[in-house]
């Protein structure tokens, strides 16, 4: 655990709530995902409601947990096999959940398809601030190697943009602390 050096110092902890999912909602421009965030809904509960076709107040803890796994897993290219292993459900059920997810959040699917196509053509992807991640294996003939590069193509703009935003916030906080002569 971190502790302040002495009584003259205080530790500051800050967190952006669901930053990566907010970024994917923004860059994919998916209406359903944007609506959930804009209305202050819990994105995992909203996803469970959409995927399972039930009202938000009917979502169980297990359904929310499953939706949370799907929300984060989709960004990292989770397969039906991987989802079935994580959720301990049959592979067919996992495939149905992934299919329903993309039906309810088509903007996310479009983002993924367009990002892979861009990466194949240009050999890189970018964060929202233009920082590039080069993907030398994006056109590999080896399917396993290519799939890994494709997953990186999809998640690098999301994770990288998140990192960019957090670093900017840290710089702004540091400047404000110096300005106010705080330690």
Walk through the language-model features, giving the residues of each.
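Conserved catalytic core of nucleotide polymerization and phosphodiester-bond processing enzymes
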Residues: 1-183
